[in-house]
Amino acid sequence: MRFILRHLHSLGVINKFDSFLLHFHTKSLKSNHTLKQYLESGEPIKALLDFRHRFRQSPSFVDSFSVLFAIKVSSAQKASSLDGRQIHALVRKLGFNAVIQIQTSLVGFYSSVGDVDYARQVFDETPEKQNIVLWTAMISAYTENENSVEAIELFKRMEAEKIELDGVIVTVALSACADLGAVQMGEEIYSRSIKRKRRLAMDLTLRNSLLNMYVKSGETEKARKLFDESMRKDVTTYTSMIFGYALNGQAQESLELFKKMKTIDQSQDTVITPNDVTFIGVLMACSHSGLVEEGKRHFKSMIMDYNLKPREAHFGCMVDLFCRSGHLKDAHEFINQMPIKPNTVIWRTLLGACSLHGNVELGEEVQRRIFELDRDHVGDYVALSNIYASKGMWDEKSKMRDRVRKRRMPGKSWIELGSIINEFVSGPDNNDEQLMMGEISEVLRCLVSCMTSFDCVIGKKM
């Protein structure tokens, strides 16, 4: 580059070259500023249209910043994966696939639309992979799209390649372990991380992630030990522990900790104010212990004392509180008085209670409300089928069971053995497995036939 500039200078055209660069730079800045204004003013569609127009009119004025803005715009307007692939193709065409910020943004975009395969393609084609932000984006993409096994595998590869860790990437890895219930693996990751980088041991966010992993995995004793050992605590620390107790059937411990949270923490000389997430844990604890009046009091306190606006989760907890206590009428009235439109989760909570208490009339009404939102959930048919069965309405039950058989999908679960995550499927989910199941059944049939021919008594020793 220096040789070219010297040559231009010797020819006396360097001033013209400077003018061209200045013109090019000014045009790009104006274009990028316009895109930024559209994005900040909440008009992502206009920004994307403007970007496409400018590219068609004068492709040379599109720089890496323009492309970066276009990706952000696509993410902001929840664009389709096709839009992302078009920008992805442009990135390749312009040779920007070595720009980490662009590649990281593309990974984030594909993750937001659930297209993890394309996100991985972007990751793999990035020539320089020493940037921790890129690894974090890809591992987060797997975790956010319910592919925690791949997230852990990629984290292990990152460790093997000696990429410098930070608190964020370890937090994401612990989140993946929490999703899988892989406590041992999470503990190993945390231990290795603080050995490689000692200051991570003082990272409160990271310790909160470890606490959250214990909580999600039902390890409340380990969670409480970590909680008590933490010199510093914030609202997330308390909220995670309150949630942990509530989720694992220790409602009284959850409510006691909530009371302690609101008193002065002598070690920090501060009062930790609960947030909206904290109240979800508190309401869950009230629900699981049948404390209807206390739950109603906390729900009111959240609004009046802490000026917090209830979200769907809070309304859902209140409906669950009424339903668990058998107050179906109160639950129904509460739903009808909600300031927001109730979602299927809230209606299904009431439907489950109708099934438990055999309330056919209310159950049928609730199912109609659910079908207005979603007709494909198998559990809705099962719940109503159980209601019919409890009342001896066998014809209606039979119709519901027929619908269930047509819609049922196999479930999945995971188990940690050593340092390996194993996946199990409740039924065959592809043709190969169906063939294998058929072969196993045939072999079993032959064995039974042979045993019978030799006068063996199945299930007894000879």
Swiss-Prot record:
Signal peptide: none annotated. It comes from the Eukaryota. PPR repeats lie at residues 63-98, 99-129, 131-165, 166-200, 203-233, 234-268, 275-310, 311-341. Keywords: Repeat. The keyword Repeat applies. Disulfide bonds: none annotated. Residues 346-418 are annotated as: Type E motif. It holds the Pfam family PPR. One of its GO terms (molecular function) is RNA binding. The keyword Repeat applies. Residues 419-452 are annotated as: Type E(+) motif. GO terms for biological process: RNA modification. Belongs to the PPR family. PCMP-E subfamily. This is Putative pentatricopeptide repeat-containing protein At1g74400. It comes from Arabidopsis thaliana.
